[in-house]
Amino acid sequence: MTTVDNRQDFKVADLSLAEFGRKEITLAEHEMPGLMSIRKEYAEAQPLAGARVTGSLHMTVQTAVLIETLVALGAEVRWASCNIFSTQDHAAAAIAVGPNGTPDNPQGVPVFAWKGETLEEYWWCTEQALTWPNTPTGGPNMILDDGGDATLLVHKGVEYEKDGKVPSVDTAESDEHRVILELLHRTITDGSQKWTQLASEIRGVTEETTTGVHRLYEMHRDGTLLFPAINVNDAVTKSKFDNKYGCRHSLIDGINRATDVLIGGKTAVVCGYGDVGKGCAESLRGQGARVIVTEIDPICALQAAMDGYQVTTLDEVIDKADIFVTTTGNKDIIMASDMAKMKHQAIVGNIGHFDNEIDMAGLAQIPGIVKDEVKPQVHTWKFPDGKVLIVLSEGRLLNLGNATGHPSFVMSNSFADQTLAQIELFTKPDEYPTDVYVLPKHLDEKVARLHLDSLGVKLTTLRPEQAAYIGVEVEGPFKSDHYRY
């Protein structure tokens, strides 16, 4: 583990990987036209000058391009990953070293991330990303979040400082909750206002994923949201591209790297048919699997049926399928009692943000069960009767734990959304009182437009009379905010 304190503070696995990481970043830049175009467009204006951005998002090669885009637009950045398994260590090393540094003289961005963190290390990294030495409040003035963990930590810190105490660790509902409480016990002392002061200067947060957006809407509904937020996840160029086409690519990449099992001819169950589920089902069918979908929503269920998938309950197929993938963003989708009914050597994985879709704690508590590591993030679980299940990434994101996540081109869409959302909140604070917003439609269309040339797309241009006929401007936006793409 490399920790260096000279010009920058950071903690990564191995700085010697920086050259490899830099080569992959250079390749990714070519595949990320949205971000590179934004760098060029805004380089002179420096719209993020003065921004202190705390990032909590998977520390991948693609994220490295995002980080260096924020820096190119004037921001200072501190970064942590948002998943214990998702960091690509060579990318983290390259960011810590920087484009002009060396492993012996790192000159990059403070990043706190490595693959295979413990929960304690993970939340320490998040705390470090939120800690800004030599600043008035000791913290950021912007957050770029994925899953909402950085936002959660700030809000819980403020809540407990207001209450005057942190709940007892004995009240923790999970191992992760216990770690969070321990961290806040350590950072909140009598009369401490660390988190309250830190939150006071935050202009806003831009949130990447469905689960984090749910948290934001819950806090706003409860009246506890401390600063404005832009829901990047529901930008069309994020949810309809990253969620669907990204998962279509990365799900089978993760399964193949983890197991080398032929997918063709297998029966695969996809739990959930939202944008992520749609991409997963399509990828599995493309490999020749017979795909079955489970759904709670009648609209999504009807979509799945009309797309040609059997839609039924998990109970109906639990003992028949070979592959199970959870995609819901909900909890307790596949329970230990379900896994006890599965076939020998069934593969179980999750592609939703958190690790609570699959009941890993319940699985571990089955009497006589034996867990064995095949290789990192691939484990067999042997039941007393000899049956074995293959569980990927310990129930966490398999596409990042077992593979490298979504490809650069699709992430260019999402990260262009993130960059424009950061500019929007940072430069227009008076236009965004505390609430949860979506990315303005003209910016959503801008992001799509930035990616067309790379694919050889030529747009038709409306004539003025045509634009007037449908009630839009010639240059757009072309759809209403409620249009469903």
From Swiss-Prot:
Top-rank EC class of the record's enzyme: hydrolase
PROSITE patterns (UniProt xref): ADOHCYASE_1, ADOHCYASE_2
E.C. code: 3.13.2.1
Cofactors: NAD(+)
GO molecular function: adenosylhomocysteinase activity
Pfam families named among the record's database cross-references: AdoHcyase (PF05221), AdoHcyase_NAD (PF00670)
Alphabetized InterPro entries for the sequence: Adenosylhomocyst_ase-like_sf, Adenosylhomocysteinase-like, Ado_hCys_hydrolase_NAD-bd, NAD(P)-bd_dom_sf, S-Ado-L-homoCys_hydrolase_CS
Catalytic activity: S-adenosyl-L-homocysteine + H2O = L-homocysteine + adenosine
Manner of cofactor binding, per the entry note: Binds 1 NAD(+) per subunit.
Sites where the protein binds NAD(+): 209-211, 243, 272-277, 295, 330, 351-353, 399
GO terms, biological process: L-homocysteine biosynthetic process; one-carbon metabolic process; S-adenosylmethionine cycle
Subcellular localization(s) per the UniProt record: Cytoplasm
Annotated positions binding substrate: 60, 146, 208, 238, 242
Keyword terms of this UniProt record: Cytoplasm, Hydrolase, NAD, One-carbon metabolism
Cited Gene3D superfamilies: Adenosylhomocysteinase-like (3.40.50.1480), NAD(P)-binding Rossmann-like Domain (3.40.50.720)
Domain of life where this protein originates: Bacteria
Pathway assigned to this chain's UniProt record: Amino-acid biosynthesis; L-homocysteine biosynthesis; L-homocysteine from S-adenosyl-L-homocysteine: step 1/1
Predominant location category: cytoplasm
Annotated GO CC locations: cytosol
Annotated family: Belongs to the adenosylhomocysteinase family.
Role, per record: May play a key role in the regulation of the intracellular concentration of adenosylhomocysteine.
NCBIfam families: ahcY, PRK05476.2-3
The name this protein goes by in its record: Adenosylhomocysteinase
